[in-house]
From Swiss-Prot:
This is Protein OPG050. Keywords: Early protein. The gene is OPG050. Belongs to the orthopoxvirus OPG050 family. It holds the Pfam family Orthopox_F6. InterPro entries: Orthopox_F6. Induction: Expressed in the early phase of the viral replicative cycle.
Length: 75
């Protein structure tokens, strides 16, 4: 957690020192990258959209038809 706080603090200082120019950067810790699954960029947010589309009231038997080894699919 201290790495994240240090990063945020440094970004705030950079913004102040650089006349409020916003800089975007991607930071990934080794521990974080080990737990992430590779995902095709086209489908990055698609899985979460599919979960929201599945009705909460349908039975577990009906959900099984949408499951794959990687995530949910919509037929």
């Amino acid at each position: 957690m201290s790495k994240i706080l240090t990063f945020v603090k440094n970004k705030i200082i950079d913004l102040i020192n650089n006349d409020h120019q916003i800089k975007y950067s991607r930071v990934m810790m080794i521990e974080e990258s080990d737990s992430l699954l590779p995902v095709d960029e086209v489908h990055v947010n698609h899985g979460f959209d599919c979960v929201e589309m599945i009705d909460e009231n349908i039975s577990n038997e009906n959900i099984e038809q949408y499951k794959t080894e990687s995530f949910f699919t919509i037929n």
